Regions:
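N-terminal catalytic or cofactor-binding beta/alpha core of small enzyme domains
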Residues: 1-98, 157
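Gly/Ser/Thr-rich loops at beta-strand to alpha-helix junctions
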Residues: 9-15, 75, 106-112, 170-173
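Residue-level detector of short coil/turn "hinge" positions at structural boundaries
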Residues: 30-31, 100-101, 138, 162
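Internal, conserved structured core segments that host functional sites
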Residues: 76-128
Length: 184
C-alpha cells in the first residue's frame, strides 16, 4: 500500500531502460515479480549475463515500497499504449497494490554535443514545492508523447499522482542523461 511505481520505457536516448536497470543494480531487495505479455510487443527477447528475460518486466522492493517496470522494446502499434495505461493504472489502484504515484521519464532530443544534463520535472501541484526546494526546474510547457503520455493521462484521470522527469538526450543511448535523473 502506498507504493511508488517507476516505469522506464524504451524511448529516445533509452533513458527509461538505462534508469531501470541501474536501479535494479543498486537496490538489493528489488526482485522480479512478473512481466507484461502482449501480442503488441515485437518478437524480441532480452538477456543479461547470459540469463534470458522478458522484454517488459516488473520488480518490487519491500524496503523502498517501490514497483519498477522496464520495457526494453516499444509496442508495435502505438494505440496499444492506451490499453497498457488502463491496465497498469487499474492494477496500481487495485487492492493488491494501492500505489500512490507513478513516475515516468522522457528524453528531450538534442543535436550536437550536450555539455550538461539538467533534470526538469512536470507534476501535479502537490509535488511542486518539493522540487523547488530541491532546486529542480519545472518544464514551463510542452508535450509528452508515447507510452509515458498515456500513463500520465490515465493517472490524471484516476487517483494516482503522476510525475514526469526529463533530461536532454542524444538520438542514441544516453547514460549521462539517465545518470542525472537517478541522482534526483
Amino acid at each position: 500500500e502506498g507504493a511508488t511505481i517507476i516505469l522506464g520505457f524504451a524511448g529516445v536516448g533509452l533513458i527509461g531502460p538505462i534508469i531501470g536497470n541501474t536501479i535494479i543494480e543498486q537496490i538489493d531487495d528489488l526482485k522480479e515479480i512478473g512481466f507484461v505479455a502482449s501480442d503488441m510487443l515485437p518478437p524480441i527477447s532480452t538477456f543479461y549475463d547470459g540469463k534470458l528475460k522478458h522484454p517488459f518486466r516488473l520488480y518490487y522492493s519491500p524496503n523502498y515500497n517501490l514497483i519498477l517496470g522496464i520495457s526494453e522494446v516499444p509496442f508495435q502499434i502505438s494505440s496499444a499504449y492506451n490499453d497498457l495505461a488502463k491496465t497498469i493504472c487499474n492494477w496500481a489502484l487495485s487492492d493488491d497494490v494501492k500505489a500512490k504515484e507513478i513516475v515516468v521519464f522522457q528524453g528531450i532530443p538534442q543535436k550536437g554535443m550536450i555539455n550538461e544534463f539538467p533534470v526538469y520535472y512536470a507534476s501535479e501541484d502537490s509535488q511542486i514545492k518539493q522540487f523547488e526546494e530541491d532546486g529542480i526546474e519545472k518544464v514551463e510547457k510542452g508535450i509528452i508523447v508515447g507510452p509515458e503520455a498515456t500513463i500520465i493521462n490515465e493517472a490524471l484521470t484516476n487517483k494516482l499522482k503522476p510525475l514526469a522527469l526529463f533530461t536532454p538526450v542524444y538520438q542514441i543511448p544516453t547514460p549521462e542523461g539517465a545518470a542525472s535523473i537517478i541522482e534526483v
